[in-house]
Amino acid sequence: MPETATGATKYLQNLWDEREAAALAAEPLALLRYRSNLLGADLRITNFGGGNTSSKFELPDPLTGRPVRVLAVKGSGGDLRSMTEGGFALLYLDKLEALIARYRGEAHEDEMVSFYPLSAFGDNRVAASIDTPLHAFLPFDHVDHLHPDWAIALAASANGREKLDEFNQRYGRHIVWLPWQRPGFELALMLQGAVAAHPGCDGIVLGSHGLFTWGDTQAECYVNSIRTIDQMGEFVDDHARRSGRSTFGGAATAAAIDRDEVAAAILPFLRGAVSTTRRVIAHYDRSDAALAFANSNWAPDLCAMGTSCPDHFLRTRICPMFVGWKRDEGVAVLQERITERLVAYRDEYVAYYTSFATSDSPALRDSNPSVVVIPGLGVFGFAKDKREARITTEFFVNAIHVMAGATALEGSGGAAGPLPQARRAERTDEFTNFHNYVALPRSEAFRIEYWALEEAKLQRMPAEREFSRKIAVIVGGGSGIGREVAVQLAARGAHVVVADQNVASAEETWSHARTKSSNEMGMAAALDLTSRESMAQALRATILQFGGVDIVINTAAIYPTPDPSGASLEPMWSKTLTINVTSNHVLAAEAAKILKIQRLPASIVLTSSANAVVAKSGSEPYDVSKAAINHLIRELAVGLGPLVRVNGIAPATVVAGSAMFPRDRVISSLQKYGIAFADDESTEALRARLAEFYAQRTITRRPILPLDCANAICWLAGDQSAKTTGHVIPVDGGVAEAFLR
């Protein structure tokens, strides 16, 4: 067992390893990184990207060589769990302290941010966060600012100050309450003043926000943080047990037994409905916490209030959209309710913006919700990609925990006097209170959501890629052209589902493609082209994972190898036509069911062949099947337009890495064309011989590679070909006999 810092806890595990910390003792920044990673590893301690950590220590000034005090603090946008030493901003502490004399008051606090880069130590250029002065002005060497649900439950309670006094008495603590104040220079001075006014205090609860803790050493700071959070968890949970009340007023409905089936049926409609400004990716949460909230009596009221902690609503928006519905009403009624609620939600959001926007406010953003709560089903989150959608949903579940904690702390007589979150008594009416849970005033929420500093952060985000926000299913993605398509789409920002009859091959493809993307932006799926049910299940899995489908690509087919003896190919006719033609029709039909209710422009790309137009003998089943594909593409384009574009490519002799060219087919072709080879040559060597032979028969004299076909498919699948449908692009190096007419 590792040696750990002392500090008994009930819920949280003390992960501090004295031996590991001792090895980092000479590097204070490395030790700060270690502390930060431990804190960020547990979402009960702080949410993704939330909170920040800091240390103050001496470093030699790069100009004078003399030791100077510096502040190391988590840089803007960093996440504690994954922080590296390079993610911390380093600043001269004396320069930060000198800024107090430059401060012109709360109305001008945003201008102070421009001074932070001027305080940077040496060549450190990590962007300092808005919370930098909050750490700088506290007279402690090591400070943690965290957003644990248990602490925010206290911070968001109408009786929060009273309950904090009770907490301090119970645990022998001296934690101070501060009312709500937007993060910034003013709050930094309030923190400084609170510590000065309360000598010996060991933490601060920020109303409607979070928690500050500290220590004289890195280990003491860490232990103080987890001990405080753990005690707050015990305090909140004890109140919940003693209250005898049902969480959120009890259940109004039960979780739907078939919730995944209903979610799969409604998600494409819902995704399309909330993508009117820009396309989004979904995350579906049907955890116990999500269902308990969604199914509760109080969910409509609490949803309307919105979240409290600023970190929460920056992703969850001002409030989630609650859709009243019961399972026995059916999916059609749910669609109607979603449509009705969306109209109201957008109107309310525009009114919210109009009420508080000033001449210098950023422009109105997307008025669609990023979180949707549906009784019986759970919580749906939406964002630009899967990771952000998951985090958005996690943040709302954090908010659910906060609401549960705050309502559990409700006393029998309610809160007495002005709400403690209000810094000034005259503003207390701006805060809303429901069963002890206090939400931020809309005006304060607007000052966060449309803060010029937050807008600047959004503007610094990297440009989106060609297929960002798109979901692509690649059938036949386990090998050859399909594999290259999956890799290319992943590299260009798509969410990729690699579907193949050979699941191991599909998983291998995704394992490679994810290196061009991220772990959460794709998956492998089993798909049998001879089974409609298998196709439907693969598409259903895609919906539950990402929310819908935008692009369907099929590169899979079979080629019945001609028998050298000249035996009839008749036994292969039915199988070839089933897999190469009928399966494409069925795949398109199954996809169309989704695309029609999703109501977003979509694309289907099928794979034909030069053989479709070149008459010859020996491969009739394959050639005829590809001729049928050409016309199927045209028929589908007419039938599914204008919403869905349908196109295809017609490759020829793509030998490299192709499952269509197994060793026996390659040998058969080499024998057919009289190309010499040795029996002991590798399959790849034989393929290379055949590919070069084919290349010399084309106009361009260049072999056709899977990447060449993938590039054509990606063009047809993407917006650059938005006005092209019913078309087949040859990718054959120039075969005159295969010119399309």
Regions found by a protein language model. Name each.
Residues M1-A472:
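Glycine-rich flexible loops
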Residues E466-V497:
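Canonical Rossmann dinucleotide-binding motif of NAD(H)/NADP(H)-dependent dehydrogenases/reductases
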Residues P562, I713-C714, T725-R741:
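Short C-terminal tail/terminal secondary-structure segment
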Residues D563-K575, Y694:
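Substrate-binding pocket helix/loop in short-chain dehydrogenase/reductase
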Residues A588, S625:
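Active-site helix of classical SDR
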Residues S609:
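Residue(s) in the substrate-gating loop at a strand-loop-helix junction
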Residues G641-R645, T724-G726:
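Short, small/polar-rich loop/turn modules that mediate ligand/substrate recognition or access, typified
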